[in-house]
Amino acid sequence: MGSFSIWHWLIVLAIVVLVFGTKKLKNIGSDLGGAVKGFKDGVKDGSTSTDTPAAAPGQVAGQTAADKTTIDVEAKQKG
């Protein structure tokens, strides 16, 4: 009674699919995968950024013209 059989899990899965739908579950999976990838990239970038020397106090690190560029975008509504 304490452990669930495969039939219990299949019934739970069927109910979840009926409630949320396959499209919503696919979007959740994609979002979760993107978050994991972003976390891994952040951890990797964090370990390499300590290797670069820091600018001396009072000095500004080299900035490129791309830092001063503004990009105008609009958000799209899902629907």
Swiss-Prot record:
The way this protein sits in the membrane is described as: Single-pass membrane protein
What are the record's GO terms for cellular component?
TAT protein transport complex
Cellular compartments annotated: Cell inner membrane
Write out the transmembrane intervals. 1-21
Q: Name one GO biological process term.
A: protein transport by the Tat complex
**Primary place of residence?**
membrane
Q: Which region ranges are annotated with the description Disordered?
A: 43-79
Give the Basic and acidic residues compositional bias ranges: 69-79
Q: Report which residue ranges the record marks as coiled coil.
A: none
Its annotated function is as follows: Part of the twin-arginine translocation (Tat) system that transports large folded proteins containing a characteristic twin-arginine motif in their signal peptide across membranes. TatA could form the protein-conducting channel of the Tat system.
What quaternary arrangement does the UniProt entry report?
The Tat system comprises two distinct complexes: a TatABC complex, containing multiple copies of TatA, TatB and TatC subunits, and a separate TatA complex, containing only TatA subunits. Substrates initially bind to the TatABC complex, which probably triggers association of the separate TatA complex to form the active translocon.
Family of the protein in this entry: Belongs to the TatA/E family.
Q: What is this protein called?
A: Sec-independent protein translocase protein TatA
Q: Which organism is it from?
A: Delftia acidovorans (strain DSM 14801 / SPH-1)
